[in-house]
A protein has these predicted regions:
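Feature marks hydrolase-like catalytic cores characterized by long aromatic- and Gly/Pro-rich stretches
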Residues: 1-95
Length: 95
């Protein structure tokens, strides 16, 4: 609902969704098993043209899949400059 609503609002040459970055995630992949190894994360919006949508990025089996690296990436896209967040010291390059 919220993504459709933001996409319906014009903001200059883009929509409000194009200029927004929303993240939704869960702290469990499979709640019945309490599996927190593969967390489902959805990032919606274009961040003012700073992120490319329409992709699935799968970090299964990759050591660089720290969630805090995603947060660093998102902060970087919003011009919030920091070198660390939680246990992460660099953003995810693919975001």
């Amino acid at each position: 609902y919220i993504a459709r609503k933001l996409d319906s609002i014009q903001e200059g040459t883009r929509t409000l969704l194009d200029n927004t970055m929303l993240m939704h995630c869960s702290s469990m992949m499979a709640g019945a098993k309490h599996d927190n190894d593969q967390l489902p994360v959805i990032v919606v919006g274009g961040a003012g043209g700073r992120i490319q949508g329409g992709r699935v990025i799968d970090y299964k089996g990759k050591s660089e899949r720290q969630l805090c690296r995603l947060f660093l990436s998102m902060m970087d896209k919003m011009d919030v400059r920091t070198t660390t967040f939680g246990d992460a010291t660099k953003p995810l390059e693919e975001v």
